[in-house]
Amino acid sequence: MLKLVCAVVLIATVNAKGSSPGFGIGQLPGITVVSGGVSGGSLSGGVSGGSLSGGIYGGYPRLYGGFGPGGVYGSINSFGGVNTNAYGLYGTSPAVRGAAQGAAATSVLGILSGVPSRISGYSVGTGGGRAFVSGSATPIGGLPYGGYGYGGYGYGGYGGYGYGGYGYPDIAYYGGSTYGNIASGVISSPTSGVSLPYGGILGLYGGYGGYGSGYGGYGMGSAYSIGNYLSGHGGYYGGSYPSYGSTLTGVSQSLSFGRAIMSGQAFGAGVPAFGSVNFGNFGVGTGGIGILGGGGVIGSGGVIGGGGVIGGGGVVGGGAVIGGGGVIGGGVPTGGIIRKKKY
């Protein structure tokens, strides 16, 4: 049986203050997500004055082209890892590039929750072209924000980006919302005075084996997780010339009441990425959207359920430690090694 691996390409472009001819409509650049396709498949056309073309082969995206002054792209699957890349955000600090990626990744988490959500997060430069990124997506309706809390990290302890030689901490924030499959918000940095609006439509398309097409994440076959397989670039664009790109790697986690959080480390400012990181099996399921049920924390592929810690293929259940084919059950100790004494 084929396992579902649903790869998604994510583009989130940003325009600096004001609008530029050919760079979108007003100040709102585009965000586009494309996934699915067993082999072949391509998307070409204009989104806010830009174009995307290329094919998706075996679920792994190939991306060419770009939008306006810069963009963010990545992949999404069921393994619970985060990997997005930014390029073309010239003149921005690692924290700003990390925030752009965090906003895009967290917006996807909000879209996948299936309800309108608030997006919130921050990015802090840690020196050497790196930044720590954290954020959350929370359904609108009076629930408190999920996430890690600003106070716990102590901005003063991080190395600054060194604007003007003074070593001010490199900090950037992002905030916005999602509605249906539309995302919008603003990225801002008090250190550099940058304000970057973002927004657009996220289109989510189906996966393998009859999972079909989905709108807003339903029937998509992947839960709250940003993927980890992305070929190419690694902090460089066009091969040998640095474009001040960056790569974000990390993990995402679903919480109760439809909330989700993500955190990771962004590498940027022309510093090559240190390879892709697979944060596999982070307790995020492989299907469905809910917390209880297939693909949630409890359910098929989740922490408890078929393929999870407890259930078929897990620690307790068929094919695992306890259950058919496992240590205890229709496998080795019971019905395998132990025999009835014949008289």
Swiss-Prot record:
Disulfide bonds: none annotated. The keyword Secreted applies. Keywords: Secreted, Signal. GO terms for cellular component: extracellular region. Prismatic layer of shell (at protein level). It comes from the Eukaryota. This is Shematrin-like protein 3.
